[in-house]
A protein has these predicted regions:
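Glycine-rich beta-strand-turn "strand-cap" elements at beta-sheet edges
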Residues: 2, 39-50, 76-101
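Short, flexible segments with low predicted structural confidence
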Residues: 2-3, 18-19, 35-37
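Short, well-ordered beta-strand segments in beta-rich or mixed alpha/beta enzyme
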Residues: 3-10, 39-70
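An amphipathic, aromatic/His-enriched active-site/gating alpha helix that lines ligand/cofactor pockets
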Residues: 25, 29-39, 57-91
Length: 101
């Protein structure tokens, strides 16, 4: 059963560019190495550029565990987590409707 999640966080304003680089590295890893992470969208808020939201879809629990234990996720944790103003908020969702297959 697919797992849908979001991750929301805010970093110190001085760390926005560094955070964007870390996000791009993580997403590139997901794209090339995690075939069962079937959706990964990382967004930056327009009005408050230090706020970010990621939208994720994992094919199953194994795909989620693969993502969480990847070297790229570990690197993201090391570089971004210390820069957040509050802990990253992860939420899991149930899909109600979509235009995507």
């Amino acid at each position: 059963m697919p797992i849908y999640m979001t991750a929301e966080y805010q970093v110190h304003p001085s760390q926005v560019e560094k955070t964007k680089g870390s996000v791009r590295q993580l997403v590139e890893h997901v794209k090339t190495s995690e075939p069962f992470t079937t959706l990964y969208i990382a967004q930056q808020q327009i009005l408050i550029p230090s706020r970010f939201m990621h939208i994720l879809r994992f094919e199953d629990e194994a795909a989620l565990k693969t993502h969480q234990s990847s070297p790229a996720s570990a690197q993201f944790v090391q570089t971004v987590y210390p820069q957040t103003l509050k802990p990253i908020e992860f939420m899991e969702y149930k899909l109600i409707a979509t235009i995507n297959p």
